[in-house]
UniProtKB/Swiss-Prot annotation:
Residues 196-199 are annotated as: Aspartate. Belongs to the class-II aminoacyl-tRNA synthetase family. Type 1 subfamily. One of its GO terms (cellular component) is cytoplasm. Pfam families: GAD, tRNA-synt_2, tRNA_anti-codon. The record marks H30, G81 as: Important for tRNA non-discrimination. Its EC number is 6.1.1.23. It is found in: Cytoplasm. It catalyses: tRNA(Asx) + L-aspartate + ATP = L-aspartyl-tRNA(Asx) + AMP + diphosphate. Keywords: Aminoacyl-tRNA synthetase, ATP-binding, Cytoplasm, Ligase, Nucleotide-binding, Protein biosynthesis. ATP binds at R218, D219, E220, Q227, E485, G537, L538, D539, R540. This is Aspartate--tRNA(Asp/Asn) ligase.
Length: 599
């Protein structure tokens, strides 16, 4: 039907006759001539309908926004002064010869150039929303990124293998999405949170290098960077150690950015341990564009009169300082807003000191309600360690280590971007390595895996699995970019005895382990190779590349933060016949029936 895409007609096509199909983006009458901006996925082109062609002009008078049309016309140069440098086709226009309406359109629920729409409106009318040029650019970039991943992995000898979508529910990690079995009453499949165990089994089977771009499912509370179903670039390889795996993955990310954005990322990526990241940035995914850093002052305030500091400092907590250069100019109102902000992360307050004269480490040179409760030696140490200068402000966090890290880490990022404490680098990737193997869960009173229970401990820490699990480090690594974790992985356990030892450290006994993970333990007995891998969040990578506010802007049909699809009204009710076939009764309906019977 067409000879060209609208957005690809250029001055190279001058004097040619072209046939175009697309949507009417905008129609306007001007001096007896009708102008149509015709749109398809490649962009816009201006079409001119002259009254000299009466039939064509009459048809043009009847069309409205979002009508689908086909036209044939001649490409000509726009009159001088009317060019549009923002369009690929901005130097030319098409003089329309014939025009046919392929389909009319009802009045759209909103204009495509309306930037003030609520997300609910956009998601309810997602088909119309996806016609917006920015949304089409986002999804086209997503396609380019996915293809770049594939090209790189194909060239490196990785093979694409599909793994099951209906699998076994395991208790580790987030909640599973369960699928009832009709043919096995009372039993359930689970949708995979990741292909983790299957890709390990593929390594045991000898496939050496695997990848898959696949959907994963997690029934967890949603945030701006989370969805109940998300897309993962999943990778596993055999006979490579941690350094070799991360080197290949680093090359891959550089290749993807080069292909998709024509951007050169640093070579090599910086690396830091998890302990260093938490100490300096309060985060295991630090945004290195922000130049602010945390400074630990726990030891300096153990004997001060200010119990808010000395309490955590003497009971295993943390006291950290965040120096804000020139921050003494912050108003009381701004400080109050930052105090509210850290409260989101569990902080019970936000102490601060304004440094009016750094040469006077007392209430003469320092302005704060807390100065009188800190002795001069502590104040001098704080000023020296933070590198404070006159005119600066120092914020403090004092609490359990996790609360301090979460609160000051988030405040660091917020202050950095709001007040301009950022470097000139547009992209700051960083490997974070040597994660703790376990973390203690106060609610269940047991150790849980920081990554997952199939991660190998560092060789020199194997003996700590039983004696001091909290000190055991893992062969785990995450790749962070601009404050987002875009990928994470580890070297896996490839020996059955070691896997059983880790299960026991997690309070998973041999019988329970065999029941839940027997297929893995059995496979590891048959000559499993050393192996490891990594998974990248495709949605997150594309979100960063586009600068979108949410990953929902780079997914064609996303769920809301309440895990709903407003377009299809899912999840929804199903009829009783389907439930009976699945051997399911709804508790709410049963309770309602009982109440009716009692009445």
């Amino acid at each position: 039907m067409r000879t060209h895409y609208c957005g690809q007609v250029t001055a190279a096509d001058l004097d040619q006759t072209v046939t175009l199909c697309g949507w009417v983006h905008r129609r306007r009458d001007h001096g007896g001539v009708i102008f149509i901006d015709l749109r398809d996925r490649e962009g816009l082109v201006q079409v001119v309908c002259d009254p000299d062609r009466a039939e064509t002009f009459h048809t043009a008078e009847s069309i409205r926004n979002e009508f689908v049309i086909e036209l044939t016309g001649k490409v000509r140069r726009r009159p001088a002064g009317t060019e549009n440098p923002n369009l690929v086709s901005g130097e030319i226009e098409v003089l329309c010869h014939t025009l046919e309406v392929l389909n009319a359109s009802a009045t759209p629920p909103f204009q495509l150039d309306d930037d003030n729409l609520s997300e609910n409106v956009r998601l309810t009318h997602r088909v119309i929303d996806l016609r917006r040029p920015q949304m089409q650019k986002n999804l086209m970039l997503r396609y380019k990124v996915a293809m770049a991943f594939r090209r790189f992995l194909d060239a490196q000898g990785f093979i694409d293998v599909e793994t099951p979508m209906l699998t076994k529910s395991t208790p580790e990690g987030a909640r599973d999405y369960l699928v009832p079995s009709r043919v096995h009453p009372g039993q359930f499949f689970a949708l995979p949170q990741s292909p983790q165990l299957f890709k390990q089994l593929l390594m045991v089977a000898g496939f050496d290098r695997y990848y898959q771009i696949t959907k994963c499912f997690r029934d967890e509370d949603l945030r701006a960077d989370r969805q109940p179903e998300f897309t993962q670039v999943d990778i596993e390889t055999s006979f490579l150690d941690e350094a070799e795996i991360t080197a290949i993955m680093e090359d891959m990310i550089r290749y993807v950015f080069r292909e998709a954005l024509a951007v050169e990322l640093p070579n090599p990526f910086p690396r830091m341990t998890h302990a260093e990241a938490m100490r300096r940035y309060g985060s295991d995914k630090p945004d290195l564009r922000v130049t602010l850093e945390l400074t630990d002052v726990t030891d300096a305030v153990q004997d001060v009169a200010f119990k808010v500091f000395s309490g955590p400092a003497t009971s295993g907590g943390r006291v950290a300082a965040l120096r804000v250069p020139g921050g003494a100019s912050l108003t009381r109102g701004e400080i109050d807003e930052y105090t509210k902000f850290v409260g989101i992360y569990g902080a019970r307050g936000l102490a601060y000191i304004k440094v009016n004269d750094v040469t006077k480490p007392n209430d003469e040179g320092l302005q704060s309600p807390i100065v009188k409760n800190l002795h001069e030696e502590a104040l001098r140490t704080i000023l020296e360690r933070t590198g404070a200068e006159s005119g600066d402000l120092i914020f403090f966090g004092a609490d359990k280590t996790k609360v301090v890290n979460d609160a000051l880490g988030a405040l660091r990022t917020k202050l950095g971007h709001e007040k301009g404490y950022v470097s000139g680098a547009a992209w700051t990737p960083v490997w974070v390595v040597d994660f703790p193997m376990f973390e203690y869960d106060d609610e269940s009173k047991r150790w849980v895996a920081c990554h997952h229970p199939f991660t190998a401990p560092k060789d020199e820490h194997v003996e700590l699995l039983e004696s001091a699990p909290g000190e055991c480090l893992a062969k785990a690594y995450d790749l962070a970019l601009n404050g987002w974790e875009i990928g994470g992985g580890s070297v896996r356990i490839h020996r059955a005895d070691m896997q059983s030892k880790v299960f026991r450290a997690l309070n998973i006994g041999d019988e329970e382990a065999q029941l839940k993970f027997g297929f893995l333990l059995d496979a590891l007995k048959y000559g499993a190779p050393p192996h490891g891998g990594l998974a990248f969040g495709l949605d997150r990578v594309v979100t960063l590349m586009t600068g979108a506010e949410s990953i929902r802007d780079v997914i064609a049909f996303p769920k809301t933060q309440r895990a709903q699809c407003l377009l299809t009204d899912a999840p929804g009710e199903v009829d009783d016949k389907q439930l009976r076939e699945l051997h399911i009764r709804l508790r709410q309906k049963i309770e309602t029936q009982v109440e009716v019977a009692k009445a």
